[in-house]
A protein has these predicted regions:
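Enriched but not universal
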Residues: 1-17
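Active-site and NAD+-binding cores of ADP-ribose-processing enzymes
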Residues: 14-134
Length: 134
């Protein structure tokens, strides 16, 4: 749906999509590697999705994340992410405040507005914050 836009945004940052995905995996492996094969996570380049790929493959399942919101994020290049942990490279994050609250229990929920290219998406519900890749 928005693949051309995402690829154009990544190209504007002087990096190809394949190189971006490869660097994303390198960052994740160095900051928060998946050490098992039964949890959802990113282990290889094949697991990395762009925001557009994630939402084209499955719609959001959390009621506080709408298709219109995701479309506006893709158009602006920015998205607000939430996490039960401080948001640093390697942190699992979600566009859903509700989902982050479920994970945090009675603890704080952290949020940050980031580039849509600073998240390696796993699916439409969650991804891993990787920071800005150049």
């Amino acid at each position: 749906m928005y693949n051309n836009l995402i690829n154009r945004i990544i190209r504007l940052e002087s990096i190809t999509l394949d190189k971006w995905k490869s660097k994303a995996v390198d960052i994740i492996k160095s900051t928060n590697p998946m050490l098992d094969d039964y949890h959802v996570g990113i282990r290889t380049v094949d697991d990395v999705l762009t925001l557009e790929e994630a939402f084209d493959s499955e719609p959001p399942t959390n009621p506080d994340v709408s298709d219109d919101y995701i479309q506006s994020c893709i158009e602006s290049g920015k998205i607000r992410i939430y996490s039960s942990k401080r948001i640093i490279p390697g942190t699992f994050a979600t566009p859903s405040k509700m989902m982050a609250k479920d994970y945090s229990g009675s603890s704080n929920v952290f949020s940050k507005i980031v580039s849509i290219n600073s998240i390696a998406w796993i699916n439409s519900d969650e991804g891993v914050y990787i920071g800005n890749i150049k």
